[in-house]
Every structure is written in structure tokens, then in C-alpha cells.
């Protein structure tokens, strides 16, 4: 993919491809947290198990409760047949296995694209499906997650459901947790969803240091842009929970009324606004009780499996795996691969957690910590980090202007003879997205139709572009594509 677009070409995104050493968060060298290996590893295992329980046990409630909440009153966590792959955990699984085999925690963009083309082709939806179609025409991360090119990217909930495992990689290091998580969630999102990534990754990292939900939430708030919408959402939910501590239904109604922002149901329940609110509410009303937290996540509804998985990860870290095992829940130690060809078919919950633990050890060491033995016991010495906003919100108009300036030469180069079909298709797509199609049509009337013909050789991309995208971004791109002369694929 020598001609594919990579972030190395663009200053706007270049930070995402740098090595971790360039981003070592500043920590006080005298301020360390020491945890026994037994405790740290138990919390990582608890976080993963909480994520799996939240994800899979809430699937019956996923996108089921919209205007009104659910009515679950009793629930016993269980995985009697073991866990299985689902997009709330298996995209992270693909990354973790690859990171184990890599010298860096921050996989390069073309490596990530290769992983998707090998393993992540089915059982993906919304922004992630759009990502996979953009990869077909040679667009690599993080541009696959640019709102200018991916109409789901400025609201999609994958900024949350692809971040939890990375929070487990950086215990007590919320800045590092957010940074690693952003590297991978930027494959599919930007903007407000990137604030959700930082919010929840930082909260998971902080859960290794305290069981106080309010302190964990404070760390999350310190990790997001002070002017982002999610800050107001979290502030509102906290206020409503304090006002109605015994009436979660009223809080749910207030969330629905204020943050159901669009007419389209899919846009709303797939958006970071309602999902962030529901997750925070579940944590506040659950107050550290694993079962109560997940019941609340189920009942708040919307994209419930996403919300329960995130809340379950946080409370799972607090409780630890040994505590969960003492509850006598039916849990079979299995992680069945039902969705990701080429990935291990013999994975268990234990081996999945082992992978996270191994990488977490590397992350701790890369940030100035160490694993040592004292009095016959193995201890992790972890540099404590203060939570901080790693990536503020950027002005979308400025981003679009920068992309247009930097991508235009590549678009023009595709007008030459002997250019590959993929390069021509990519040029047509980029021109449509960046508002350059009209000028190309006028200035190159003989070549522009050839670019469109090349793009029409990718019917799966046209399908998500012209038929499957919701919200203002989807409407904008559809209108631009049709105005440029793009034809809908034959049904």
C-alpha cells in the first residue's frame, strides 16, 4: 500500500504515529504507587471479566429501551458457556495480540490497516464498518476516523467501547491510559468521542488507586477538554443523581429530554452523548456495587451493552477477580472466537487477561516504573500520574482546511495517466469529502468521470456512503457525492 494515505504526511495527525517514548507523561519521581503483583493482576483480571460480563449479559437490552427505560430488577452475572467475541471486546483483542508481538505499544497505521483487513471484516457496524470500507481505497488510520471522511466519526460510541482494555494497560497512569486509548480509538472517531475515550480510559486507570466512584469520576473530568459537551453531560448527570438519589428513572428522563439531540433514533442511541450519560449514571447509582451498577446500565438502555461493559470494567477493577470468583457466579473460563478469522481459537478469559498483564508490565516500565522483588514478593512500582487532558477539541473547520491543503496535491496526482484504480477512487472520494469535486469537474472535465468510474468499482463503500450513514455528516456527504455525479450502486 505504498500510495495509501498515512498520517506521516499530515502535521494534523502526525503525533499519533510517534513512539511512546516521545510521549512519556511527566510524573513526580518520588510519587509512586506500589502494588503487589497479586493485587495488580487481580484487578486487571477483574476489569476484563467485568467488561465481558457487562458486554455479553446486556446484549438482550442493547438498543431495546429508547423513550422509556427497562425494568430489570434482579440479575445474577453469569457466563455459563464462557465469553465470546463481540465488537465491544474483540477489536481490542486483535490489537492486544498484535501489541504483544510488537516492540511498541503504538502500532503503526499501516499495521493497523493490515490487522483490519486480516481479522476485522465482519460483525462491525456504524463507524467501524465505514472505517473498513475506507481502508479498501487506501485510507489508513487515523484519517479513517476523521469526521471529514467518516460521517460517523464525530459522534460514534466506539470512542468508548474500544477504549476499556487500554485503560487496563496503564494502572494509576491516566494520562498514559488516555494516550494509548486515543491511538486506537482514532481509527474510527474524533471530536467529542475522543473526549469520551479520555474520560473512560482515565477513569479505569484511576480505579486501580481508589474505590471512591466520585474520585474516579473527578479524574475522568480532569482528563477531558473543559469546553467539550461531555463535560456538561457528566456535570448534569452528577447533579441530577444528587437531586434524585433514590429515583434513577427521573434522572434517565432528564437525560433523554436534554440529550436526545436528533430525530434519527440510530444517531441518538449510537452517539457518545446518551451513552456517556447512561454509563456515568450507572456508576453513580450503583455506587461500587457490581450487580446494581449493571442493572442500572441495562435499564438506562440505548446502547446498553457498551455502557454496561464500560461500567463493568471500572467496578471490576475495584472489586478484583478473586472477589468475583467468591460470588459463585457461573463463569466458564473460555473466550470463544466466533467473529475474528485468523485469531486464536483456543483463547480463554485467563489467557486474554494474561496478554493484558504482559503488556501492562511493559507500559509501566516504559513510563519509569518497574517490577521488583521485595521480601520474596513481586511488586509493581508504578509512577503515579495526575489526570490531564491529553487531546483538546479541535475546530472542525480548521481540520478540514488543513486536510484540504495537504491532500489536494495527492488528489491532483491521480489525474495522471496510468494511475491505479485504487488511487483514482481515493482521489474521487477525497475530493467529494473535502469540497474539491466541483472545481475538479470544471478544470478537468475529461478526467473527473474516470475518477468517479474508479470509485464506483467499490460498491461496498458507496453503500455506506449513500445509504447507511446517519446524522448531519452523512447527509452532507450524500448530497456532495450525488452533486459530484456519483451514481448509486445497482441494488
Model regions and ranges:
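Extracytoplasmic mature domains of secreted/periplasmic and thylakoid-lumen proteins
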Residues: 103-158, 166-169
Amino acid at each position: 500500500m505504498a500510495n495509501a494515505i498515512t498520517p506521516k504526511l499530515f502535521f494534523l495527525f502526525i503525533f499519533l504515529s510517534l513512539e511512546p517514548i516521545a510521549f512519556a507523561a511527566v510524573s513526580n519521581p518520588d510519587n509512586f504507587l506500589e502494588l503487589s503483583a497479586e493485587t495488580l493482576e487481580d484487578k486487571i483480571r477483574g476489569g476484563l471479566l467485568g467488561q465481558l460480563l457487562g458486554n455479553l449479559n446486556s446484549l438482550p437490552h442493547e438498543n431495546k429501551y429508547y423513550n422509556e427505560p427497562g425494568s430489570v430488577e434482579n440479575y445474577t452475572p453469569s457466563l455459563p458457556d464462557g465469553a465470546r467475541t463481540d465488537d465491544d471486546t474483540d477489536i481490542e483483542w486483535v490489537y492486544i495480540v498484535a501489541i504483544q508481538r510488537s516492540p511498541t505499544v503504538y502500532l503503526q497505521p499501516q499495521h493497523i490497516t493490515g490487522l483490519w483487513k486480516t481479522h476485522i471484516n465482519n460483525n462491525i457496524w456504524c463507524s467501524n464498518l465505514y472505517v473498513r470500507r475506507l481502508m479498501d481505497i487506501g485510507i489508513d488510520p487515523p484519517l479513517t476516523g476523521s469526521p471529514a471522511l467518516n460521517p460517523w466519526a464525530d459522534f460514534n460510541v466506539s470512542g468508548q467501547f474500544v477504549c476499556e482494555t487500554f485503560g487496563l494497560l496503564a494502572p494509576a497512569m491516566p494520562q498514559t491510559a488516555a494516550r494509548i486509548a486515543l491511538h486506537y480509538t482514532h481509527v474510527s472517531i474524533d471530536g467529542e468521542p475522543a473526549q469520551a475515550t479520555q474520560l473512560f480510559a482515565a477513569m479505569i486507570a484511576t480505579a486501580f488507586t481508589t474505590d471512591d466512584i466520585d474520585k474516579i469520576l473527578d479524574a475522568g473530568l480532569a482528563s477531558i477538554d473543559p469546553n467539550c459537551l461531555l463535560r456538561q453531560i457528566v456535570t448534569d448527570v452528577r447533579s441530577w443523581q444528587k437531586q434524585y438519589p433514590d429515583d434513577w428513572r427521573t434522572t434517565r428522563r432528564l437525560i433523554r429530554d436534554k440529550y436526545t439531540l436528533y430525530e434519527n433514533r440510530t444517531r441518538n442511541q449510537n452517539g457518545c452523548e446518551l451513552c456517556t450519560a447512561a454509563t456515568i449514571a450507572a456508576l453513580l447509582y450503583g455506587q461500587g456495587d457490581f450487580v446494581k451498577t449493571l442493572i442500572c446500565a441495562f435499564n438506562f438502555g440505548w446502547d446498553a451493552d457498551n455502557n454496561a461493559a464500560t461500567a463493568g470494567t471500572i467496578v471490576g477493577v475495584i472489586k478484583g477477580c478473586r472477589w468475583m470468583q467468591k460470588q459463585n457466579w457461573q463463569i466458564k473460563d473460555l473466550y470463544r472466537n466466533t467473529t475474528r478469522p485468523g485469531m486464536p481459537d483456543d483463547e480463554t478469559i485467563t489467557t486474554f487477561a494474561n496478554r493484558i498483564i504482559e503488556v501492562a508490565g511493559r507500559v509501566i516500565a516504559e513510563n519509569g516504573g518497574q517490577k521488583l522483588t521485595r521480601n520474596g514478593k513481586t511488586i509493581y512500582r508504578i509512577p503515579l500520574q495526575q489526570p490531564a487532558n491529553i487531546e483538546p477539541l479541535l475546530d472542525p473547520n480548521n481540520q478540514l482546511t488543513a486536510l484540504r491543503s495537504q491532500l489536494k496535491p495527492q488528489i491532483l496526482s491521480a489525474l495522471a495517466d496510468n494511475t491505479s484504480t485504487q488511487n483514482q477512487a481515493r482521489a474521487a472520494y477525497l475530493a467529494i469529502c473535502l469540497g474539491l469535486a466541483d472545481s475538479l469537474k470544471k478544470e478537468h472535465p475529461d478526467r473527473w468521470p474516470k475518477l468517479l468510474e474508479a470509485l464506483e468499482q467499490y460498491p461496498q463503500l458507496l453503500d455506506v456512503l449513500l445509504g447507511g450513514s446517519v446524522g448531519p455528516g452523512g447527509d452532507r456527504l450524500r448530497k456532495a457525492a450525488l452533486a459530484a455525479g456519483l451514481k448509486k450502486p445497482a441494488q
